[in-house]
Amino acid sequence: MYKFDPKLNHSAAHVLAMALTKFYPNLSLAIGPAIDEGFYYDFNLNDPNTSITPIDLLKIEKEMKKIAAQALTFDYEQVSYEQAKDLFKNNKYKLDIIEENKNKPLSIYHSGKWFDLCKGPHVENTKEIKAIKLLNIAGSYWRGDANNDQLIRIYGVAFNDQAQLDAYLVDLQERKERDHRKIGKDLNLFTFNNLAGQGLPIWLPNGTIIKSQVQKFINEVEFQFNFDTVITPILGSIDLYKTSGHWDHYKDNIFSPVQIDNEVLILRPMTCPHHTLVYSNELRSYRSLPIRLSEHSILHRYESSGGLTGFERVREMILEDCHVFCRPDQIEHEVINAFKMIQEAQEGLGIKTFEIHLSLNDPNDKEKYYDDPQMWEHSQNALRKMLKDHKIPYKEMVGEAAFYGPKIDFQVKTVLNRIITVSTIQLDFLLPNRFNLSYINENNEQSTPVMIHIGIIGTYERLLAILLEQTKGVLPLWLSPVQVVIIPVNENLHADYAKELNAKLRKHLVRSSLDLRNERLSKKIREAQIQKIPYQIVVGDEEIKNDKMVTYRRYGSEETTTVSVDDFIKVLENDIRSKK
């Protein structure tokens, strides 16, 4: 086991800066904080002809260990604004920080002759840093702004004993093996190509099969819960998003508009404005509510290039999106209905909710949130009461609401110990008003419906990333792109039966494949294991002679089983039905 000590890692960041200063005396140090897992330091070498390579990390790490062994203390000194400016007069990054904090206390920490602008805290001396590892080099921008200087960032970790570092490095290797980007590449599920554009995923045939199977399952869940499927345009008039409020509150995440003829259009970042148009397409009565709509839609949202991460953060995504239009007295029933729908979907996908967040607005942030205190109080209290009444444990998260209303977020803890929002239920009193939605109530008067946004699985891209990392790519049979591989012992003697068997399995909608390559049997079996194919069938003389039986082996098992073809198909059907 290991535990990160922020104070220790902050001190290790200073040790890294000391080592860097020795090897690169002309550099400008920027910032070096402790982070959730370790530390980093950002800096500018101030020399376009000099770079730092992974090999350089070894010598820097070696120097860090020498410095740590010297038991240098971390001595605090408070300085004035003028003193700080003088001490760091040749470092524009430190001067920027000093200027930002000129009306606050400023301090530096000394370690021997070296010092840095820092608030602390730190350990007593460097000898407490018993184990150090520099992990990688990355790029960053000063203040995280692409318009500012590009800096070099070195990440590292520090512990107070070697055993913790060793345990962490083992865990880190496991994470690399579970990284959905690596698994996706190994299993030919998806790819990216800069010629297509950054952050624009290309679903390969194997990945498309997984996506199709998930969508088929989710469509069935939506059908069971009485949702009607619609299809709306991938483009929308800018006026649509101005009416909804997205243009005012979400503009930075929307791709630039394009003018076509006399219209200004944008690639849609979400479907909710379109679904209000479906609702308003006909006159609604209180008796016809709730209206439940679903769509699996392609959306486009701008992400900075530095924020793009495999399938987790992309610029084009496929979102499973549901919207309910209901009467106020139906809110509780519809929210609970959404809860049940999400739970059923997560159970089928093997996903378990870690905790539930009630995401609220920040009343002080008038720019991010629609300014209607009464609406926020009403909607947030409605969700809060519902969660309490049904004894559903939750955490309140201020500042995490959508701009138009509060939401219930279903948080999933991945095997990599990351907390990710997969499913969501959002209560919205704003959009129905902005689009003048109405229904005829029991008094034959117009009333405004409530809109509930429901995301059962979120985006398919993020869901696939989670599934790959949870399963290490060993997907259940119903999701596996290739469910069975048929391998003849001899391509000449056994190919005909292998083809006949393949045709029969495919007739039963089993995703089987033939491996008729002129390769060693052991190599074919090994490659089937690498591809994580759930079932392998080896066809030889015995299978053909013995009433055309099949001998199969499950992925990860050395044990083989011989059964009739019909019985094997029953095994597959049972696994698929139970979503094993």
Swiss-Prot record:
Annotated gene: thrS
Keywords (alphabetical) are: Aminoacyl-tRNA synthetase, ATP-binding, Cytoplasm, Ligase, Metal-binding, Nucleotide-binding, Protein biosynthesis, RNA-binding, tRNA-binding, Zinc
Task: State the Gene Ontology BP annotations.
Answer: threonyl-tRNA aminoacylation
Q: What's this protein's name?
A: Threonine--tRNA ligase
List the catalytic activities from the record. Answer: tRNA(Thr) + L-threonine + ATP = L-threonyl-tRNA(Thr) + AMP + diphosphate + H(+)
Organism this protein belongs to: Ureaplasma urealyticum serovar 10 (strain ATCC 33699 / Western)
Q: What is its EC number?
A: 6.1.1.3
Single annotated GO MF:
metal ion binding
- Return the annotated region ranges for Catalytic: 179-476
Q: Which family does it belong to?
A: Belongs to the class-II aminoacyl-tRNA synthetase family.
Fetch the HAMAP family from UniProt.
Thr_tRNA_synth (MF_00184)
Q: Which domain of life is it from?
A: Bacteria
